[in-house]
Swiss-Prot record:
This protein's encoding gene: ftnA
Binding site for Fe cation 1: E18, E51, H54, E127
One BP annotation, GO: iron ion transport
Transmembrane annotation, as ranges: none
This protein's name: Bacterial ferritin
Enzyme Commission number: 1.16.3.1
Length: 154
């Protein structure tokens, strides 16, 4: 099925962002695991798996629309401390949210309602799961202090 070139190109852009999110969560999850922060490892590993699912859905849609996926991920921001890692992941989620909103508008403009629905589902996941959880972690660190937070994540 031939898709609109603008939609395909934007889906490719979104794919690169999802691949970056996957890779950033991957390295952060393994760092948490190495540091013995098991709860953070489990949560961020789960986020990595969800970003992989997002990338898969975009890739499948690009192929269905007769486009060519670009598997080169956007740049990563790898933190070196837990607060830096949470901040980097949150910045990435804010960026993804903005890109998804633009993509939804573009899909509606070109009457590609299936792609729009895929992006809307990813937007809901980004806002209601990923972003919300990361913001909550920042609030916990502020409320109980970093040492107590880290102890709670072992």
């Amino acid at each position: 099925m031939q898709g609109h070139p603008d939609v395909i190109n934007y889906l490719v852009t979104l794919l690169k962002g999802e691949l970056a999110a996957r890779d950033q969560y991957f390295i952060h999850s393994r760092m948490y695991e190495d540091w013995g922060l098991t709860k953070l490892y489990e949560r961020i590993n789960h986020e990595m798996e969800e970003e992989t699912q997002h990338a898969d859905a975009l890739m499948r849609r690009i192929l269905m629309l007769e486009g060519t996926p670009d598997m080169r991920a956007d740049d990563l921001e790898v933190g070196s401390t837990v607060p830096e890692m949470i901040e980097a992941d949150l910045k990435l989620e804010y960026k993804v949210r903005g890109a998804l909103c633009k993509g939804i508008e573009l899909c509606e403009l070109h009457k590609d309602y299936i792609s729009r629905d895929i992006l809307r589902a990813q937007l809901a996941d980004t806002e209601e799961d990923h972003t919300y959880w990361l913001e909550k972690q920042q609030g916990l660190i502020k409320a109980i202090g970093l040492e107590n937070y880290l102890q709670s994540q072992m």
